[in-house]
Amino acid sequence: AGKEIEKTNAENRKRIKNSFMRSNMDIEIEREYSSVLNGFSVEANYGDLQAIKETEGVKNAFVESFYKKIEPVENSMLTTGSVPAIGGDIVGGDFGYTGKSSVVAIIDSGLDASHEAFASVNNPKYTMEDIAEIAANSKLTIGTLAVSAVYKSEKIPYAYDYADVDTNVSGGDSHGTHVAGIVGANSGGVVQGVAPDTQFLIMKVFGDSAAGAYDTDILSALDDAVKLGADAINMSLGTPGGFSEDSAKTMREVYNRVENAGIGLYCAAGNEYSAPYQGASGNNLPLADNPDYGIVGSPSTYSAAVSVASMNNMKSTSPYFLLGEQQIRYNDAAEEKSGQLVSLSGSYAYVDCGEGAAADFEGKDVKGKIALIRRGGEENGEPLSFMQKEEHAKNAGAVAAIIYDNVDGALVSMATGGLIPCVFINKSDGERMCSAADKTVQISETFIGRFSDDYSGKMSDFSSWGTTQDLQIKPEITAPGGDIYSTLPGGLYGSMSGTSMASPHMAGAAAVMDQYIREEQDGLNIPQTDKNKLSHALMMSTALPLKDENGNLYSPRKQGAGLVQLDKAVTTGAYLLN
């Protein structure tokens, strides 16, 4: 029956394409879809949209949407501890559930496939021969391309750049590599993902120089993910306040087909705080005549997708310098070691330089020393930027700048010009440095420590609020996303924050649950389509509701069911199912 349906669908697509060719419309077929959608993408004049819709056999036509990567909100502290926070260390260490024989499709900006953290996997689901067999029997986007071109390694049996139409998936930014590390890095003591033994289908939908991704490429990736038998899909991309116009019905059907194929679809909820954030009220609260908080992003708003909110990590592993015996942790914005504070290494005097305006350096000897600067201030009637402070410090002869916050709060990132090493510390540490009798600090690349603060284990303030515009409860569940340490291109490691980091925790968790259900529940003969539903129900039923600093539960519109708890999901004796 399936082959007959596939044949009929192909004939219908051919009939419509022939109708286009006979028309006066200037239409070029770009991609065909056959698993999540019976259709194709075309390049055509906008003025022909209605005529395309009225073509016999066409159910719908719409202008494709543009999705942005859900960018990290701050690149603050180097972190560990997110996997233990969701019980991943217990299910891996005590039960042996590490995502064996599972595969996760990562629809993102690509991957550094040569990174040491993606070198090995135990009990892989797919070999190159398996991928070749699927390609021979399914119409993948790669067409007649040799499978050896998309098979990168045992860990990465399939990788393709849908945006640039080539096999180079490493040309994008660091976003996709960081996301993949959270799902399933396996680099021993440096970084271990939630499912270290899962395989990756790397589906690059962001062009090397593009700021976002288009439906054309996302649909191709989803279509292939279904054909390739993904157990879970991660999509850390979206648009705020998700709801679309003509595309809504069709895209809803697409995501429903992904779900009906037994694949868990995990999407970032978004980093847009709430609808009234920085709005007309002036206090980040909604007006009485417009009480809507919801700004959770699409595609996480579709009912078939799981919308994932972000919690701040439990522990942060951060670089620090010494003020006497006091450890002062900091955030270094520089990506290259040569531009980081640790490039100085040794004992350095520092000078209090106020807010870092040019006038603040007058009469002060900072040559060969570090400038200590307070955040904020003005110069010539305009706010002082971090880059201006850095420039003034360099011009005065400083070898580095330490900028401290002017308000209490978590460490944030700052934009710098790379003129001299610049790091950011919190307000209390900056004030301690100002009042210290001995204004000398010790710097070393070996100074790495573990810290927690008042924000650890709390919901990330940036994590987008629900509900959706049609009042669905979104997000559904929470995972660590604030200050997550993971893989970066070039064999490096570093931290990012955002729901983009929370969603892959869930995709990795789904791979772990897939192994658990396959090994422990096979006697029940659960169909693949129902395995995903059982996995979702177990994780939702055992999630831990989170409380704020006052001991009050966060709203489900902020955290969904709560923090995923893998160790509870694989040991619970009961669960809820809707």
Map each language-model feature to its residues.
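Subtilisin-like serine protease catalytic core
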Residues: 92-214, 228-231, 259-260, 275-277, ...
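Short acidic, glycine-rich surface-loop motifs adjacent to enzyme active sites
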Residues: 222-245, 268-269, 368-377
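C-terminal subdomain of the subtilisin-like protease fold in secreted/lumenal serine endopeptidases
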Residues: 234, 307, 412, 418-436, ...
